[in-house]
Amino acid sequence: MAEYKDTLNLPNTSFPMKASLSVREPEMLADWQAKGIYQKIRKARVGSKRFILHDGPPYANGHLHCGHALNKILKDIIIKSKTFSGFDAPFVPGWDCHGLPIELNVEKKVGKAGSKISPREFRAKCREYAASQIDIQRDEFQRLGVLGDWYNPYVTMDYHYEANIVRALGLMIKNGHLQQGFKPVHWCIDCGSALAEAEVDYEDKTSPSIDVAFSAVNPSEFLNCFGNQLAVKPLILPIWTTTPWTLPANEAVCLHPEIDYALIDADNSYYIVATDLVESVMARYGISHYKTSGSAKGRVFEHFKLQHPFYKRQVPVVLAEHVTTESGTGSVHTAPAHGPDDYLVGQFYQLPLINPVMANGCFAENVELFAGISVLKANETILAVLSERNVLLASESIRHSYPHCWRHKSPMIFLATPQWFISMDKSNLRQAIINEIDKVNWVPDWGKARISNMVENRPDWCISRQRSWGTPMPLFVHKTTRELHPDTLELIEKVAVMIEKSGIDAWFDLDSSELLGDDAKHYDKITDTMDVWLDSGISHYSVLKHNNDLDFPADVYFEGSDQHRGWFNSSLTTAVAMYGVAPYKTVLTHGYTVDAEGKKLSKSKGNYVALDKLVNQHGADILRLWVASTDYRHEVSISEEIIKRNADAYRRIRNTARFLLANLFDFNPASDCIDAKELLELDRWALKRCQLLQEEIITAYDNYHFHLIYQKIHNFCAVDMGSFYLDLIKDRQYTTAKDSIARRSCQTAMYHMVKAFTIWLAPILSFTAEEIWQTIPGNNSESIFIEHWYDAWPTIDAVNMEDWEQLHIVRDEVNKALEETRQRGEIGSALAAEVTVYADAKALPKLTRLGEELRFLFITSEAKACPISQSPKGLAVTDCGVSIQVTASAHEKCARCWHRREDVGQNQEHPELCLRCVGNISGYHEERLYI
């Protein structure tokens, strides 16, 4: 038997089947860095319209986790896709560097500032630590294939950035938004500092749930409000609270003006309780025999006096809208020093603002009964005092959501302390922000309602902190009037210049007389630092407005859903406070990373997926494919099994690219591309399909629907290519003459397709796309990322896509019939079969038009199409209106193409070949029109 293998055009490529991503990716990353690919991308887009995605700065502390990877990869996909669309899309990464987590890590090593180490030395250690963390995270982000200006990032501890934070504060002062006040703020005892809303986590906590009797000083004035002649006896207004430790600061009891309150006659006392709560309250007190003796609105009791339950002072009844009947008694214990609602009520009624609790969380020494006791341990003592005085009506434990410090995970308290605030209402800032929210595109759209609700309900923003490592508030306050220095704005700019030169130590080391001269003796120098959310929040000012390569406002901010209360909020608030407009046009939000069951990832739960392990084991491109495969608008599941599924999808994509490349091994696009008019119809269909798909993919990129791109590309590889086009072209590609029109037509199509396909992949599978790009024949650009979306398509005459869709459907039905025949043992491969398709009037012309090439559609040795009317009796009709008859071929098998043909053996020189193969190896170019 002659050997004909060498007469075939068998595929050949240096592009390996095994990806070995964990080895190749670092090599490619080093090559990108050595060649300065990011800088070359920027140079290639000079003068183009800009697209600015502004990076929300991660905190410079610790190694990256899967949530970081999700965020940065999503951003990278956007930046790269916009670059392919022709935009100048720079990416300037950032890091958030001040604040408590860094302080805590430094404290573990050197102790607290002011004890074992000076504050100045402590700040230097914090700066050093943050810089080391940036180096770690920079390498880890780059390992993910994220391109950006990594060695020119914005860093909130850079001197020029710190100076701009100070300048931003000055601009907000100029616009009338800063005020000082003695207000209740979230206070972390462990931090020893106020915290912002964004630094508060709500977790379940067990607390005492108690009802306390406040007795009427003059029961008669209460009873008279019910309009009946009632016997005078003790009258109680009971309150319900889960924070007994706040009772020493009680200054009032609050009712709702429009709620109906019932007068309950029980035993030897009256009780006034919200009508809707009477039954539950009486049950809680164990009182089964009682009667309702009247009803009145809460407003009628305003200013009546009650006796404090354990102090010799009287407190008034006051009114407010925040009182509800969802729980409790309808009467709310009010301590202006320990809650925002209480504070506002206290301001309205001019109640005393007395704070009995010190910064360390203990009652002050002058607090009667509880001096020196920690508020976190005081509840038991307070309950004992209440019980001793017979004013504890009910007591139990309750599990409820309670604010905790985001860093220490410890319960927080509301504490009235002297702080600095951005007023939400003083200069109509709240309404201005709400107006700007309406102008922003929120994706998903529920983000608008979420941030609107937060802005509408947020208290004034406490921006001062009592910390060592942070940007200072460079303010001087008059010792007597407590007013800011009249030259505050000029002084702030002077300090900003100093910080720009020497960093924040310039303020902390400053002697007031250096700026104020003789005035210094009249002013206190403020030592507070600023909220880190203000640091990152003014990046629109320090970065977008001060970097000539960027624009304000940004086109996109893109972060996790928790940033509606964090960076989205602080950025919006500061931008509107500074110059009246939102800092972004579109806000995209992604969900949290969770496990396969939707549970939070946790090392203690054993479901934590380590990012470095994933990258080292599978490669960054598998992780990038996972990101693209998810609908990021919801929670994003990750597990080893999910990653393995993505690895399977990756292999299909890689194998598709490898097949295309392997069949271009002898193709020179400069000389071997054929004219579009000579392309076979199947190749024209494939090119048209790619062009249409590219339009869909670009639209999906523009709409940030990356999971749809994943689905489209996977379907393209599996269906359009794998089970159809690439299957059909094998015979033509391998068996026809090397330089034949039939073969070059296929190669021309594959060349255009692989170039387009690779660019589609590049925003997602960045390393793999670059590897493919460098293997494509021809003179290609140095990096795929300098390219645009593919636009060098040949001009394709009209292709009837519906006809080919019908042929595809019929082929699928034929494959089913072939498989059934194979299962019965009647044939081996499809080439051992001959097929007759009986088709209806709609399908028949589409099949008969292919003539002798119909067999190449089914990859059988013979095929013909006949009218459905000629179908043998009993032959089933498929859903697409055809009947299929499969028979085993009786002819000999060609040793070269493996088709079983009647003419095998008719050529004496090549007795093992069919005449088609004889012609192909003898220099005769087989002619094809369709397949």
From Swiss-Prot:
Q: What is its EC number?
A: 6.1.1.5
Record: residues binding ATP? 603
The UniProt note on the cofactor reads as follows:
Binds 1 zinc ion per subunit.
Q: Where is motif 'KMSKS' region found?
A: 600-604
What are the names of the required cofactors? Zn(2+)
Keyword Aminoacyl-tRNA synthetase belongs to the record: yes
> What Gene Ontology terms describe where this protein resides (cellular component)?
cytosol
Q: Which reaction is this enzyme known to catalyze?
A: tRNA(Ile) + L-isoleucine + ATP = L-isoleucyl-tRNA(Ile) + AMP + diphosphate
Q: Name one GO biological process term.
A: isoleucyl-tRNA aminoacylation
Could you list this entry's UniProt keywords, alphabetically sorted.
Answer: Aminoacyl-tRNA synthetase, ATP-binding, Cytoplasm, Ligase, Metal-binding, Nucleotide-binding, Protein biosynthesis, Zinc
Question: Looking at its record, which EC class is this enzyme?
Answer: ligase
Q: Report the subcellular localization.
A: Cytoplasm
Please name the Pfam families in this protein's record: Anticodon_1, tRNA-synt_1, zf-FPG_IleRS
- Place the motif 'HIGH' region on the sequence: 58-68
Q: Which InterPro entries match?
A: aa-tRNA-synth_I_CS, aa-tRNA-synth_Ia, Anticodon_Ile_BEm, Ile-tRNA-ligase, Ile-tRNA-ligase_type1, Ile-tRNA_ligase, M/V/L/I-tRNA-synth_anticd-bd, Rossmann-like_a/b/a_fold
In terms of HAMAP family, this protein maps to:
Ile_tRNA_synth_type1
What's this chain's function? Answer: Catalyzes the attachment of isoleucine to tRNA(Ile). As IleRS can inadvertently accommodate and process structurally similar amino acids such as valine, to avoid such errors it has two additional distinct tRNA(Ile)-dependent editing activities. One activity is designated as 'pretransfer' editing and involves the hydrolysis of activated Val-AMP. The other activity is designated 'posttransfer' editing and involves deacylation of mischarged Val-tRNA(Ile).
Q: How does it assemble?
A: Monomer.
UniProt name for this protein: Isoleucine--tRNA ligase
Question: Can you name the source organism?
Answer: Legionella pneumophila (strain Lens)
User: What does the record give as the organism's lineage?
Assistant: Bacteria, Pseudomonadati, Pseudomonadota, Gammaproteobacteria, Legionellales
